[in-house]
């Protein structure tokens, strides 16, 4: 009886123990690219609040680079554009109006 369990664990018989085989987990994630570099945008217009709303969450906070995929250079430009749009009342500071 003990030999049949060992043979099953080694996979010599028809019975195969599944929890001994490694799981196939896909670890490759799609690489995020900066949409500004890809499309060749050099200037981010602060007068276009609909475009800037893509970089702001429901609470009105700026989304981080790791979520949007923008480069550091363009993340700074997005931040200044959002701040200018908020200052000129083109965008709300608080996200209550975003819903």
From Swiss-Prot:
Quaternary context: Part of the 30S ribosomal subunit. Forms a tight heterodimer with protein bS6.
RNA-binding in keyword set: yes
Species whose genome carries this gene: Christiangramia forsetii (strain DSM 17595 / CGMCC 1.15422 / KT0803)
GO cellular component, one term: cytosolic small ribosomal subunit
Record function comment: Binds as a heterodimer with protein bS6 to the central domain of the 16S rRNA, where it helps stabilize the platform of the 30S subunit.
Signal peptide interval: none
Family statement drawn from the similarity comment of this UniProt entry: Belongs to the bacterial ribosomal protein bS18 family.
Gene behind the chain: rpsR
InterPro entries per UniProt: Ribosomal_bS18 (IPR001648), Ribosomal_bS18_CS (IPR018275), Ribosomal_bS18_sf (IPR036870)
Protein name: Small ribosomal subunit protein bS18
HAMAP family membership: Ribosomal_bS18 (MF_00270)
Keywords: Ribonucleoprotein, Ribosomal protein, RNA-binding, rRNA-binding
Keyword RNA-binding: yes
GO molecular function, one term: structural constituent of ribosome
Gene Ontology biological-process annotations: translation
Database matches in NCBIfam families: S18
């Amino acid at each position: 009886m003990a030999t049949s369990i060992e043979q099953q664990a080694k996979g010599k018989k028809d019975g195969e123990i599944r929890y001994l085989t490694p799981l196939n987990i896909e670890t490759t994630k799609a690489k995020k690219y900066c949409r500004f570099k890809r499309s060749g945008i050099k200037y981010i217009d602060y007068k276009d609040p609909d475009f800037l709303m893509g970089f702001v969450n429901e609470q009105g906070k700026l989304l981080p680079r790791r979520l949007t995929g923008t480069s550091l250079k363009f993340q700074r430009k997005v931040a200044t554009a959002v701040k200018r749009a908020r200052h000129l009342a083109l965008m709300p500071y608080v996200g209550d109006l975003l819903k």
